[in-house]
Amino acid sequence: MRGGATEPGPMERVRALCLALPEAFELETWDHPTFRVGGGRGKIFCTSAADGSTLTVKAEPAEREALLAQGDPFYVPPYVGGKGWVGVRADHRRTEWEEIAELIATSYCLIAPKRLARSVTSPPSLDG
């Protein structure tokens, strides 16, 4: 980046992607950020380590199997891994943020109320 500006870290990127989705909000739970949609405390569509180094998202069964077959950076997360969620390590230089944006959007659409899910026509972008 120019002018001495630093590139955003993983947590800033995860936060930006999640909060770009309609009516999404952040709530700290279990000492780390959770991203939610819906009324009240909402339903979780993404969780992240406090530093953004890992995140978990809900995936369609076939997509989840394909991701897990690739191995690193994908893994079965504790607690929710058996319920259709997949973990992603997002703390290395080769992190593909476009793919993470797609995974976050898919998770959001699986969790969000139908009226909100229908409004997502493309993954969120880090380009503002």
At which residue positions do the language-model features occur?
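Charge-dense, helix-prone N-terminal extensions
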Residues: M1-G128
